[in-house]
Amino acid sequence: MTEKIGILALGHGSRLPYNKDVISEVADLIAEKYENTVVRIGFMNMDDPTMDEGIKAFEGTGVTTIVAVPLFLAHGVHTTEDIPQILGVSRENRSTTIQLNGNDVTLFYSEPLGADQLIADLAYKRAMEAME
């Protein structure tokens, strides 16, 4: 049996609707490309679903592991303190075990997007688009 992975795409949240739209679109793109991955979204504040609601949205999906991925470019107080506290993980141990449908599920907390060639390529692409 292959492990079924869940990805919880985490956003900050905003009063402006396009913030939620972007997080939702990124989650949809992940789900379309990686078919055996269940993708849900959750927000730190100002938007629904909350992170807790996002985790609960995995109920009934059969995932055995969830990876919470902050869709933030770099570390800050939210990624180092607020989100880990909500998820029940620490800086030293970025994983925990949660219960979903009476089963143990491992929850991992990933690094933010960070410095990566894909981010650099996207920044260059946006620069070229600005000149069109």
How should each PLM-predicted stretch be described?
Residues 1-132:
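Active-site-proximal alpha-helix that buttresses catalytic centers in soluble enzyme cores
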